[in-house]
A protein has these predicted regions:
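N-terminal cationic and glycine-rich segments that engage phosphates or anionic surfaces
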Residues: 1-66, 72-73, 77-120, 131-134, ...
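Long, charge-patterned amphipathic alpha-helical coiled-coil/hairpin "stalk" segments used as oligomerization
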Residues: 87, 92-194
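Glycine-/small-residue-rich active-site loops that bind phosphorylated ligands and cofactors
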Residues: 75-76, 168, 205
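Short glycine/threonine-rich loop/turn motifs
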Residues: 171-226
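Residue-level signature of catalytic and energy-coupling elements of molecular machines
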Residues: 13, 69, 161, 213
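A generic "alpha-helical surface" signal
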Residues: 48, 135, 208-212
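Short His-Asn-centered micro-motif
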Residues: 70-73, 163-165
């Protein structure tokens, strides 16, 4: 797992924060300077936090536990959903339903309903319903798939969540905190880094910044999964 270089972080615009008037003073330790009214993030601190977060995520993945990816802002959705799929981890990129984790039993019931509808449509077991009812079912399944598709295979609460933009995803942050689930997050200059366990100071609005940080998180998870698989094979022999 190779950490991005200073120049790579710079090229990805990771250092660009928000206007000074929007800053959160608790981000002071991660800010390098102010330039033309905009706070610039200290990329050396970003690199330190990245490495710390990566090592922790690697160990979680190595232990066989699930890590949920959360990013519902438009510029992050595709990046994060593809990243999560690449390591077979759950994700939420459309809308965070209240109680996604704190009311997990209800969410599982909704997922079960979605899967039942999908099975029924796939099997063609729809002879007893009208075309209008069939259309309604199809639309309901599509709507549920958009919101719940990323957690369809999540049978227990995740052990950690990786979040892009903790202001936007404050519900996810709050639920994770209430349940004692470890939080890893990209934290911009307008946010409170103390709200998460592993803050990564970074521009959470730029797609390039989101991609480079998310990619490193995925590489850490992949490394953990590979080490886990190697240990399982060794034990089997």
């Amino acid at each position: 797992m190779e950490k991005p270089s200073y120049n790579q972080l710079l090229d990805a615009n990771v250092h660009f924060g928000h206007l000074r008037k929007k800053w959160n003073p608790k981000m002071r330790q991660y800010i390098f300077k102010e330039h033309k009214g905009v706070h610039l993030i200290d990329l050396n601190r970003t690199a330190e936090c990245l490495e710390k977060a990566g090592q922790a995520l690697k160990q979680i993945a190595k232990s066989g536990k699930k890590i949920m990816f959360v990013a519902t802002k438009k510029q992050a959705r595709d990046i994060v959903s593809e990243a999560a799929r690449s390591v077979n981890m759950p994700f939420v990129t459309e809308r965070w339903l209240g109680g996604m984790m704190t009311n997990f039993t209800t969410i599982r019931r909704s997922v079960k309903k979605m899967n039942n509808i999908e099975r029924m449509l796939a099997d063609g077991n729809v002879t007893n319903i009208t075309k209008k009812q069939l259309l309604t079912l199809s639309r309901e399944r599509e709507k549920m798939e958009r919101v719940l598709g990323g957690v369809a295979n999540l049978n227990r609460l995740p052990s950690a969540v990786f979040i892009v933009d903790i202001l936007n995803e404050h519900l996810a942050v709050d639920e994770a905190d209430r349940l004692g689930i470890r939080t890893f997050a990209m934290v911009d200059t307008n946010s409170d880094p103390n709200l998460v366990d592993f803050p990564i100071p970074a521009n959470d609005d730029s797609s390039k910044s989101i991609e480079i940080i998310t990619r490193y998180m995925v590489e850490a998870i992949k490394e953990g999964l590979e080490e886990r698989n190697a240990e399982v094979k060794e034990e089997a022999n």
